[in-house]
């Protein structure tokens, strides 16, 4: 017999046709879970989540997951970020982890030795980091070649742009950041900190296809860039509301793409600055989402299209709610 988690027993089971293929079985499972989690939240589920919410801090990844209606929005957030159901890490995500670890190592060595390490040393570190992801042999070979080529091109083009004042993986978990009533946390890939002039500039590394502008051409790219831009705003709020860096001037933020452009071979980056009004509105959005999360009042997104337009509309509707 199938055992149902006790906090889901209030949900009336829906009979779904049997599935014969793995793909069909996955679809059935996803549909069934979506229906269960879209039902009104039981008191027992709220009790299960209460200890988590007592110490919960909102990260930009969790915020993005809550807002992205193209990927399930609040229900996806509940399943993956609050209930923390296990999910397989994709080969692309494993590749991204290895690239980030390699660049973190570069910054750590530069900060310690005050000179750039040889490219070969970083490439060896990348291989070791990728091996630690335990990819299938074909995926490992594919991403080893891809990452080696990308890092070689990136380090060749950007070697003069690295500084020993840059701090990798600056963690704000214990900085006491509260924005819009929400406890926030996060790590900055790179923070260039000028203690004399009290300025801080943030760089976030991105793997994958680079973008030439903030506009985006496809719906997928528009959603991706929308999230990226919110990520940089989130980091500015983290810095300005933190214990140690609140009195620093936020000098700017950059998305630094690691992989070269397919057509030109150029290494691209996107920078942006945000107005006081834009940051205030984003902080208000964070506050609304925080209250939804902590009250476990997850909005029904069935009326929104699963695309960029639906995501923007969802955010606008959240902002219009009475605080």
Regions found by a protein language model. Name each.
Residues 2-6, 58-61, 73-77, 90, ...:
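Generic recognition of stable, solvent-exposed alpha-helical segments in well-folded globular domains
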Residues 3-109, 305-323:
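C-terminal, charged and often intrinsically disordered regions of DNA end-processing helicases
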Residues 61-62, 79-89, 110-111, 128-138, ...:
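Glycine- and acidic
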Residues 167-242:
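Non-catalytic protein-protein interaction segments used by genome-maintenance enzymes to assemble
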Residues 12-28, 236-323:
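Metal-dependent nuclease catalytic regions and adjoining charged, substrate-binding loops involved
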Residues 69-79, 121-123, 199-213, 257:
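Active-site-adjacent bridging/hinge elements
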Residues 109, 157-162, 194-198, 242-248:
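Secondary-structure transition/capping motifs at alpha-helix termini
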Residues 102-178, 267-277, 290, 314-323:
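A non-catalytic, helix-rich entry segment at domain boundaries
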């Amino acid at each position: 017999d199938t055992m149902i988690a006790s906090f889901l027993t209030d949900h009336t089971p829906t009979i779904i046709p049997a599935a014969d293929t793995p793909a069909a079985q996955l679809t059935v499972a996803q549909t069934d879970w979506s229906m269960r989690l879209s039902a009104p939240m039981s008191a027992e589920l709220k009790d299960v989540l209460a200890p988590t919410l007592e110490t919960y801090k909102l990260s930009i990844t969790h915020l993005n997951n809550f807002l992205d209606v193209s990927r399930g929005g609040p229900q996806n957030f509940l399943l993956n970020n609050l209930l923390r159901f296990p999910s397989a890490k994709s080969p692309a995500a494993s590749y991204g982890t290895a690239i980030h670890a390699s660049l973190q190592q570069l910054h750590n060595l530069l900060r310690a030795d005050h000179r750039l390490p040889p490219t070969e040393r970083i490439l060896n570190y990348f291989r070791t980091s990728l091996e630690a992801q335990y990819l299938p042999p074909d995926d490992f070979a594919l991403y080893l070649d891809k990452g080696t080529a990308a890092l070689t091109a990136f380090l060749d083009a950007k070697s003069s742009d690295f500084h020993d004042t840059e701090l990798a993986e600056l963690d704000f978990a214990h900085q006491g950041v509260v924005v819009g009533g929400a406890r926030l946390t996060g790590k900055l890939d790179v923070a260039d900190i000028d203690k004399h002039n009290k300025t801080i500039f943030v760089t976030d590394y991105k793997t994958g296809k680079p973008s030439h502008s903030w506009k985006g051409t496809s719906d997928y790219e528009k959603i991706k860039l929308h999230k990226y831009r919110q990520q940089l705003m989130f980091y500015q709020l983290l810095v300005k509301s933190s214990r140690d860096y609140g009195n620093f001037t936020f000098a700017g933020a950059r998305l630094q793409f690691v992989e070269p452009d397919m057509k030109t071979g150029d290494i691209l980056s996107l920078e942006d600055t945000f107005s006081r009004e834009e940051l205030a509105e984003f902080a208000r959005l964070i506050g609304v989402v925080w209250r939804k999360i902590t009250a476990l009042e997850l909005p029904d997104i069935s009326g929104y299209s699963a695309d960029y337009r639906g995501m923007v509309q969802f955010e606008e509707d959240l902002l219009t709610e009475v605080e």
